Structure formats: C-alpha cells, structure tokens
Amino acid sequence: MESSTKRIKMDIFNFPTIKETRTPEEVAESYAEAVKLHPFYDNAHCVIDFYDSGTIKDGRGEIIGVVLRKALPKYATSMASALLISAAVRTSLRSMIFGGESPLSGIAGYFDYRGSPVELKSRKTSFTYEHEEAWSAVFPVVDYVSEIYRHVAPERWKAQNNAIPDLVRIHGTPFSTLTINSRFRTASHTDVGDFDAGYSCIACIDGKFKGLALTFDDFRINVLMQPRDVMVFDSHHFHSNTEVEVSCSEEDWKRLTCVFYYRTALGEPSSYAEYRRRLEKSKQDPSFTPVVSNVMMKENGTNLNRPSPVHPVPPSPFWLPMLAHCLQHCASAAQSVHEAMTADGSQLAEIIFGEPLSTSDGIPLRGDDEKLKANGDTGAKPLSRLGGFSETDLMVSTAAEKRKYLDSEFLSHCISAQLLDMWKQARARWLELVGKEWKHMLTLNPERKDFLWKNRSEMNSAFFDLCEVGKQVMLGLLDKEAALPKEEQAFWTMYAVHLSAACAEELHMPHDAMSLRKLNVKLKDFNFGGTRYFKDMPPEEQQRRMERKQRIEEARRHGMTGAHEKRANWLTNDSFDYQTEDCVVDYAKHKWVLPERHAKAVTKNVHTAWLPTREEVVRVLVVLPDLQIRVEGVDCKLEKPDTVEDSSEWVRLVSSPAVHRLLAAAQRNLQLPDDVMHGNIHIRFVFHSTLPTDMYDFVVLQHVLSRIPDDVLASSYITRAAALCSGCLFVEETDVQCRQYYTLKYSIRRNYDAVAPHFFQQLHQASYGTKMARVRTKGELEALIPTVCCARYKLQGSPLNTTIHVVSPTAPH
C-alpha cells in the first residue's frame, strides 16, 4: 500500500507543466540547446523496425543487443511496476536528453552520488531506503533479467558479476542500480557510468502505447518493445526513442521501463573507503549487527565512459532473417543474398524489389516547422490566472480526471485519520448549506440555473473553513510545510472541479450552477484576500477560527511525522546498512518458475555464433501483380483530383525527381522478366494469379496486395505465398501513411491524408497498371499477416513509399 499511496500522491500533482518564469522564447532556446547536443530521432531516421526476438550484431560480429519478446512473467513485472512507478519523478538531472524539460525518471538500488550535493556517498538510494519493507517486490524481475543476461552473454555476465562489490548487489545479481523511466522519450545518448566489460539490460514493465522504439542511432534500427519484453544491450552505443504514435493529443498512453546495470563508481577505491569507514563506525555500536561483516575489494576493470566504436552493417531486407531467432533456419541463405545485394554497384535490389534500397531524390523529409516538439507532452502551457487556479482547458480536463483523489476512499491512504475526518465534516457542512440555499432560490424562481453566492452568508464561512482544511490536505499530500506555485495550481484546480461535480452529482444542481469560475473567484478571496472578512468578525469568532486553523494544521502534521522522519533519516544516514533490504524469494511457495529454468526456456532459440556460408543455390521467387491496364507509352502525367485545389501536400509529393522518373519509365510488369542467376542466387518471376507449386528459399510479393482490395482475400493470399517458402516471405507494399506521420502537426496530417491515397494510386497505375490500387497504412498491412511479422524494412526515399515486411511462414508455437 505504501507504493500505491506514493503513486497517488505523485499523480495528484502531475499536471501539465506551467512555468510562469519561462517565456516561450526561453523554452524554445532551452529546447534548441538540448537537441543540438542530444537530437531526437524519429522512426523515419531508421530503415528497420524490428518486431521479433533477435540478436543484433555490428559489422565485426559484436553484439549490439539481444531482444526477447514476452520474456518476463507477468506476475514479476506487475509486482515491480506497482512499486517502481513512484520512483519516476520530475527531475532536471536528465533534462538534456528530454529537450530541456524535466522527465519522469528516478533511480533505485545503490548509487555513488558522485558529483551530487548529497554529502554521504556510495549507499542506498533514497527510494530503496524509504521502501525497504516493500523492496522485495522487485527481486523476481531482477532475478529473471539477470538469468536471461547470463544465458545470452555468459562471459559479459561473469565479468560484471566478478567486479561488482557484494555490498551493493540487488538480490545477489550483478546489478547495483535501476533507472526507472515513465513516459520518457529519450534523445540520443550513451549511458555514462555503466560497466564497460558488461552489458546493461532494459525491460518494459508496464504500459499501453505504440511507438517509442529503442533506436540504435548509428545502426539505423528501431527495436520495438512492449510490456514484458527484455533487451540485453551495449548501452555505450548511442541510443534513443522514436516518437509515441498517438492519433490526437488527447489520446492517453503510459510506458514504464526499467534499466538494470552496474554503476562502476561503486567499485572504485573511494567507494571502498566509504564502505570501510562505515563498517568501522558500526563496530563501535555493540548492539548493531551488520548483515555483511567485511568489505572485500575486487578488481573493477578499466571503465573509460566512452561510446563504443561503431562498425556499421550495410542494411538490406535480407539482413533481417540473419537477426530474427525464428528465422535462423534460413539465415545463411539470407546472408548470401544480403552480401550480394549490398556489394558495390549491385543492382540486385532493383531486380528483386523493383527499386533500389535508397533513393537520394525521393519524397523529401519534413522540416522542423511542420513537426510537433519531440517532448511536446510536457511543453509549457499558457497560464490564465483568474483566481486560485488556471482555467485553461488542459488544466481543467486534467483536474476532471483527478478529482476522484479528493474522495475519502483515496484520502484515507494519504493523510491522517484526524485530518480526513475534518475534511469529511467540513465538506459535508458546506454542501449542506449550499443545498439549503439552492432550495430556497428554487422556491423563489423554479427556473433558476445559477447559484447566487452571498459573501456574508453562513455558507461562505463554511467554504472558507473547507478551504482551510483543503490547504492542509494539500500540504499533507505533499509531505511538506509549503507548496510551490505549480503545486497550488494543480491542487486548487482539482479542488474546484471536485466541489463543482459534488454540487451537480450529490445536490442535483445544474452542471454550471456552481461554476468553476465562481469557485475560482472565491478561492482567490481565500488565497489572496480572505483576511478582509476576518477583521470584521467579533473577537471571539476570530479566536475560534485561529484555534480551528491550528487544530487542522496539527492534524496534518500528525500524519506527516513518520514520512518526514524517514526522509530526514536518509539524508543523515551514516550506518553500515548494506543488504539489510535483502531477503530470500520462495519461488516454490508462490508456484513461480525458477529464474534459471525460465531463462533457459526463453533463450533456447538465441543464436550468437557466426553464420556458416551457404554454398548451395538460393532460390528466390518474385511475384508481380497481374497487369490490369496497359499504359500506352511512357511519361505519364499525374491527374490532380478536384478535391485537392491548391494543396501544399500534393505539391510536396509531386515535386520529387524520383516521382517523375517513375512516371517516365515503362511499367514493371508488362511481361515477365527472364530468370536471373546472380552467383549462387537463382531468381524466378511469376504473376500473382499463377503461383507455382514448387518450394523456394524466399518469396517476394512485389506490390501484389495492392491488387487485392478485400482484406480477407489479401490475408489468405499471404498464407498461400508463405506455403511456398522454406525460409521467409517478403511482403513489399506502399505505406500510404507518411513515415513521419506521428511527428507532424495535426493540420498537416489532415492535409496529407486528403491527397496521399490518390497520389499513390496514380503511381501504381503508372508502375504496375493497377486500375485502383488498395494502398494501406502500416497498421492495416500488418493486420493482414496471419503468422509472425518479424520486421519492417523501409526503402529510403522511395517514390512509392515502399516498405517490406519480413514474415515467418509459420505461426509461433
């Protein structure tokens, strides 16, 4: 319940950022400075979106990352996320990789605090110290991740395990520290301070979102991660996150990730000196028995905190079967095609896919003026200070979602019982008096819709009393004696929305009778001018109110004592309390699978060895769409639809020289090309209505699905084609959606959507003679795939916006 309470408190004050001290110009300057050092990379930056489990290596065979899908048990991630969600708080320490804004991030476990104003170093984080009793909730997920790491990269795991001081292990693993990120899209960075000779691990432990892939920036590959996915990776390569894929700004999403690593400064001589000092001090207290009785120094290796060297791999669609674990049976054959396709001067991509892997003068990328801010989710919003809170739509809508937190059910976990009782009584009294006055108003005018507030009424005095209680509730939720302006804004907005809703729902008043503006004006009276009523009261009433205010404050402080003591104790904690939070996890009692057995099962298909060379012939079948219409001659002209008028998006699409070359070229399927023999690669061509019956290593569907408008028939065709390949299927199609779609301003998205289908349909008519091509979005294409979609490859600059989905011929077991 402690973690749940902290999560509630954090969410109450997690309102849109309102920074009165920063002008829009200052925010823009901060953003520009941050992205200059740490740029954001959109999905379109990379040529590969990797969806399945796989091993990603660089050009010299070094592992960049190993990703495993659904590799963590649900109970383990659920337990960990319930605790760790409250560790991610607004922090300016990582603002440079969030466009100059403060992201939701935090650390747990042990930390060195080198370079920090915290006086005492090399110890438990405040989060672990404050949650010591609940800390065991993270042990299962830490154990599972450690065992997966050990099975995937045993030598790296061993080196890290041998180096980490035993005092700072999390549950006996080679991890000392966890970094927890919530709704945090990181800009390009490397992780500084991790163990050079080991790897870090990242797991998504909760969320409901699309996009936000982990990108290896120098290798141009996006790794999609969803809840329960794990990746063991070299965090010294530059990495970042792609954009979140939401259709509108109001669409809700959440994402919680945890990074597991060894913070090497904890193994340096200065940290060992701190451990020994604490141990010697503890020995002076005969009543204290440390969990660890000695400090054994270990070799920590050389840690330079430099980016890993980059040995790039020239990408192609045939590189992807070499990565995917489920396609290892055809990896050597794919390697033969990949090496031939990426050789200097090779035209194999044009032969197999009908166009090159990259086109330099294709559809242009967007400028920053057309895009949303990469960290726009937390951007500064305009402040309309009309009283006690901001009346901007975003603040009010956010408060409407959070008003439930002022219900007794939630407050009972967050403030003292005495203060809660005062809140309930003051709230009930004010509502009683409002109801009494409203009933009287309706007697005078049954058609009345607006509540008339009387400043000298008993109801007004009850409102001020409720505000006094509310103020102490706010401070009790914050666990401090004074609130920041932005915290006051958040609370009073929620307070007003809560009371307005109570009048409507409990007193059955019209929705706007007790309006937010009315409450805002009265809150302004309370917060900034309420004392003018106080001075007119009789002395005995003034004394009664002063005593009442003191009792409310004492009720609030009574509930805060324990929390404040715990936090203050951490700042001054100089004890040798290493590993006091550790305990045994009884996997058998809970009927949980043992970490070693679980890791063995989820890593059984992991391949990290070099691929053998394929000597036999590699058979590739390329399927072309049947010709529907023959375009007479070449040099086709685009017909501008009547609905377009003067669309800048239409002008942008048709401005590409590559588009004009495509229109001037002959149709690609006027007749079947002859078979091609390229080294040991044999390529055969057929029309989509005459599929053969013999087997091939690979089958390529070249814009075939655009000829099949019915989704059921299109999906069935994929199944038929997949049955012809022993390796994998390549589904090549136009993605009608702009590759930067989710980064665009909403007005530009609408303008693009209005012209893109017609534009690509005309290009298909010119290229393949398709009368009315069914061009689909990425999501629509992937919904057709009945088996496993391992990855998506994007032909760069393609005038047809061509993407290639790599599909396993069989469904997962």
Swiss-Prot record:
One of its GO terms (cellular component) is nucleus. Fe cation binds at residues 189, 191, 239. The keyword DNA-binding applies. Its cofactor is Fe(2+). One of its GO terms (molecular function) is thymine dioxygenase activity. Residues 62-264 are annotated as: Thymine dioxygenase. Coiled coil: none annotated. Residues 392-561 are annotated as: DNA-binding JBP1 domain. Binds 1 Fe(2+) ion per subunit. 2-oxoglutarate binds at residue 255. The record marks 525 as: Involved in J base recognition, conferring specificity towards J-DNA. Its EC number is 1.14.11.6. It comes from the Eukaryota. It is found in: Nucleus. It catalyses: thymine + 2-oxoglutarate + O2 = 5-hydroxymethyluracil + succinate + CO2. Keywords: Dioxygenase, DNA-binding, Iron, Metal-binding, Nucleus, Oxidoreductase. Dioxygenase that catalyzes the first step of DNA base J (beta-d-glucosyl-HOMedU) biosynthesis by converting thymine to 5-hydroxymethyluracil (HOMedU). DNA base J is a hypermodified thymidine residue found in the genome of kinetoplastid parasites, which is localized primarily to repetitive DNA, namely the telomeres, and is implicated in the regulation of antigenic variation. Also specifically binds to base J-containing DNA (J-DNA). Belongs to the TET family. JBP1 subfamily. Monomer. Binds to DNA as a monomer. The DNA-binding JBP1 domain (DB-JBP1) is necessary and sufficient for binding to J-DNA. This is Thymine dioxygenase JBP1.
